[in-house]
């Protein structure tokens, strides 16, 4: 009986020890697992924080990009967008031209602008420079003179007149050659053949030749007393209208003074502008001098500090006594 009791007691103790050991192990495992779990939780929380921060950054960047994009779209909507010439043509319902025509459109527009500027310059009026002279046996003997500022000697007086009519020379001289201009003024081949036939038909002894009037003598061979001499070619014309016609359509005669009068007008205009600028500068300089004069007078009237110091030193000198005129008389 005693042995059985001892065995039960020992079994109970062993079971308690094993239970205690198992409980210790479970506690140690729980203790070991608790910091790991906290670490895992901490790591997971850190991961969640990083994810949230990155999501916030991406959302901020995307929102800023959206704001910038929306602002650019508003600017484009507010500002009028220039349309290309092809789009304008398509809106009008016309067929767009070929690429060659589009490439040449800029050059043609530039050329038209230049030609219009030339025409507008000439439409303002052209100046003709001439001299009134007196003739004697076809030679200019005397003319009006004037005194210039540069020299005391009298020089020929040059006058100018502006054409009331619009002067249209045509295309610029760079585009048209003199041969084409001369060929336009010369008679054509058919006219020459017609003239040759009429000359061959008429005999030298026939009465038709005798009845025909003689060729008209040119104006520059007619003797005159007074006239208008062109400053370019020195030819004398009887009337101002003849001089104007000579300047405008002188190319028909093979020589034109048109360019001379244009350059002369340009040079005189430049000289006048320079003279006006010089006069304005002189007037401004005189005004500045007049303003500076009263200031200088005021400065001269006021005594300087050096003069006051000298006067005080002389008056305060003990060896020098200044007497009034009353003291001197006494």
UniProtKB/Swiss-Prot annotation:
Role played: Acts as a nuclear transcription factor that positively regulates the expression of heat shock genes. Binds to heat shock promoter elements (HSE).
PANTHER family: PROTEIN FAM170A, PROTEIN FAM170B-RELATED
Name of the featured protein: Protein FAM170A
Record remark: domains: The N-terminus is necessary for nuclear localization. The C-terminus is necessary for transcriptional activity.
Region (Disordered): 1-54, 76-104, 169-218, 270-330
Any single Pfam family the record assigns to this protein: Spt46
Compartment(s) where it occurs, according to its Swiss-Prot or TrEMBL record: Nucleus
Modified-residue entries (Phosphothreonine), positions: 217
Acidic residues bias (residue ranges): 275-293
Expression across tissues: Expressed strongly in testis and brain and weakly in prostate, spleen, pancreas and uterus.
Family: Belongs to the FAM170 family.
Taxonomy, superkingdom: Eukaryota
GO MF, any single term: zinc ion binding
InterPro entries found in the cross-reference section: Spt46-like
Gene expressing this chain: FAM170A
């Amino acid at each position: 009986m005693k042995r059985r009791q001892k065995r039960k007691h020992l079994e109970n103790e062993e079971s308690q020890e094993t239970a205690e050991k198992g409980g210790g192990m479970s506690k140690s495992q729980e203790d070991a697992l608790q910091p790991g779990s906290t670490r895992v939780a901490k790591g997971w929380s850190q991961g969640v924080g990083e994810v949230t921060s990155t999501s916030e950054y991406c959302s901020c960047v995307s929102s800023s990009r959206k704001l910038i994009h929306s602002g650019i779209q508003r600017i484009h909507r507010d500002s009028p967008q220039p349309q290309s010439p092809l789009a304008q043509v398509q809106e009008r319902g016309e067929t767009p031209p070929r690429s060659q025509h589009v490439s040449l459109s800029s050059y043609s527009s530039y050329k038209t602008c230049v030609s219009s500027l030339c025409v507008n310059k000439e439409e303002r009026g052209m100046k003709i420079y001439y001299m009134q002279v007196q003739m004697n046996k076809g030679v200019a003997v005397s003319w009006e003179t004037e005194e210039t500022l540069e020299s005391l000697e009298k020089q020929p007086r040059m006058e100018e007149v502006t054409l009331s009519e619009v002067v249209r020379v045509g295309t610029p001289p760079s585009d048209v050659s003199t041969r084409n201009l001369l060929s336009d003024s010369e008679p054509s081949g058919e006219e020459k053949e017609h003239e040759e036939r009429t000359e061959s038909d008429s005999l030298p002894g026939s009465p038709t030749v005798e009845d025909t009037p003689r060729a008209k003598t040119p104006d520059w061979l007619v003797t005159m007393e007074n006239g208008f001499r062109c400053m370019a070619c020195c030819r004398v014309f009887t009337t101002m209208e003849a001089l104007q016609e000579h300047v405008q359509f002188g190319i028909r005669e093979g020589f034109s003074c048109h360019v001379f009068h244009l350059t002369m007008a340009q040079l005189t205009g430049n000289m006048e502008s320079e003279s006006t600028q010089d006069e304005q500068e002189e007037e401004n300089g005189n005004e500045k001098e007049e303003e500076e004069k009263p200031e200088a007078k005021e400065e001269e009237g006021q005594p300087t500090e050096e003069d006051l110091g000298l006067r005080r030193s002389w008056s305060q000198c003990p060896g020098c006594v200044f007497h009034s005129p009353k003291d001197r008389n006494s």
